[in-house]
Amino acid sequence: MSIKIHHGPNGSYKTSGAIQDDAVPALKDGRVIITNVRGFTLERAYQVFPDLPNTAEIINLDLESLEDLEKMRTWFQWAPRGAFLIFDETQLLFPKSWREKDLERFDYPGGPEAAHAADRPMGWLDAWTRHRHFNWDIVLTTPNISYIRDDIRMTCEMAYKHSNLAVIGIPGRYKEAQHDAQLNRPPADGTIIEYKRIRKQTFALYQSTATGKTQDTKAGKSLFRSPKLVLLLALLAGTIGFVWYMGPLRTIGGPAAATPADAPGDPAQAPAAPAAVAAPARPAANSFLPPGLVPDGPAAAPVDLNAHPFADRRISILAHAYRKSRGDIYMFALEDPTGRHLELTSWQLIGSGYRVTPKGECVVELRYEDWKQTVTCAGRQAGAVASIAPAAPVAASADAPARGQSPLTIVPDSEYASRPWRQK
């Protein structure tokens, strides 16, 4: 049992919202409805809702009839218990200009004892403050809540401010903001806002204008006439289209190099012992051996480029540092098959989803989901070794060491002249 106020400018769906949200549920419960909403009759209600309970009743009063106007103003002297009252244009029914003396005429005839015997409120204030004792629900509509008398507003439970969204180019919908009935407008914070739409069957229950013709508001401008909003929507659409066209970004760097296929050959014509040392196969892209130190044997298996984000790059340790507050810190070098070089710290790899487990200054274990690899320092070749290293594989001679023996590298003696005390 409550008193509610629906307020807002003309054409903001106050009356239709009150009927749809409040009167229709009461009608389906079989309650008696007392109202001055034009055209809201029981005949129309049965046309829209044929299965209404037999106890449902609508008492429609005409605001332009002096007799009906007086009945609405003295509703608490004759309304049955449990009735649902919905008063449209409340500012005309209960003017704010009434003073205390004007309200004395609403005292029940015969005084408080007669009112008690008739089970009626004693007067004006008693009716509005003790409406729950008589199971009355009251809904009021007005263009401006400040038109409602203070003694009525102080008994109201909630107020609902209506705004027609057609003023920003969204026809057929309205915004309803719930707030305290003592306030003239909803506060900026903590307001419950709903966006609603009136159903067609609700409009069939009543007549919103005296002529029967209705049209939406012509005030306001479309929301899409704002250049800022149009620019924002265009930027958003362009971003989504660009991402869709480019596809998801999986790895950082260039495309993965294709694994060279084995050269075709006839195994029947192959000699029992090779006459020359075959050219070493290209190391796998994630190999940690520097170029030139390639083991003999068949080519490595193709690299799974989906194992981790940097699967197409060779990873090695460039530097190591230790801080007591942060532990081991590594600098990694990542090189792809085309020679492009990338340097990342262990923190950056951890941020990319890797797990870095230090095993020493030059040994680290990297993990990424199911992938695991041990990374070491790459080091660098000595200048002397590099100077005499052949540019291309040399054919094996007849007296070459057997396959599997360790190769012997001769380094020229660059030591200065023998010391005089050195014994020969």
Swiss-Prot record:
Keyword Transmembrane found = yes
Domain of life, source organism:
Viruses
Q: What cellular-component terms does GO give this entry?
A: host cell membrane; membrane
Q: How does it sit in the membrane?
A: Single-pass membrane protein
Span-the-membrane segments of this chain are: 229-249
Task: Could you list this entry's UniProt keywords, alphabetically sorted.
Answer: Host membrane, Membrane, Transmembrane, Transmembrane helix
Residue ranges annotated as coiled coil are none
Region of interest called Disordered, as start-end residue ranges on this chain:
396-424
Q: Where in the cell is it found?
A: Host membrane
Q: What does this protein do?
A: May play a role in phage assembly.
Q: What is this protein called?
A: Uncharacterized protein ORF424
Q: Which organism was this protein described from?
A: Pseudomonas phage Pf1
